[in-house]
């Protein structure tokens, strides 16, 4: 099974999750600025909400790499929202990519809100989530 990990982060919160998933699966995680060089069965894509949507950079990544994405598995952080799946699915659907029902999400630090998140427990949970998805 070919698996890839990509993420986009402004604060560093989602990168922490990407690194935890990377360590659990022994697969290098990259920023969305790095295109997929080959077909992936599963793409773990991490992002957060910015103005109640995913960043246009993430949307562009999905569209520009559509021919190399089998299925998307979302992960992410945010201070307020509880899922990245809906906005990612909206984009993926336009280019015919399936999005897994499985998703990992945790709180992320935003100013004084949710200090120290994601924390060690969140990172452990993200790693366990990734292992479960690829079993």
Tell me the role of every PLM-derived stretch.
Residues 33-39:
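Short amphipathic alpha-helix with an adjacent loop that forms part of the alpha/beta core around
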């Amino acid at each position: 099974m070919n698996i890839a990990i990509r993420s986009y982060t402004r604060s560093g919160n989602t990168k922490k999750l990407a690194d935890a998933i990377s360590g659990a699966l022994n697969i290098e995680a990259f920023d969305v600025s790095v295109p997929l060089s080959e077909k992936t069965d599963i793409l773990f894509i991490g992002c957060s909400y910015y103005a109640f949507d995913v960043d246009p950079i993430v949307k562009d990544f999905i569209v520009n790499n559509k021919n190399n994405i089998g299925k998307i598995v979302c992960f992410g952080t945010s201070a307020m929202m509880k899922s990245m799946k809906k906005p990612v699915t909206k984009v993926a659907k336009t280019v015919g990519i399936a999005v897994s029902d499985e998703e990992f999400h945790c709180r992320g630090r935003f100013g004084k809100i949710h200090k120290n998140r994601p924390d060690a427990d969140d990172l452990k949970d993200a790693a366990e989530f990734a292992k479960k998805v690829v079993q």
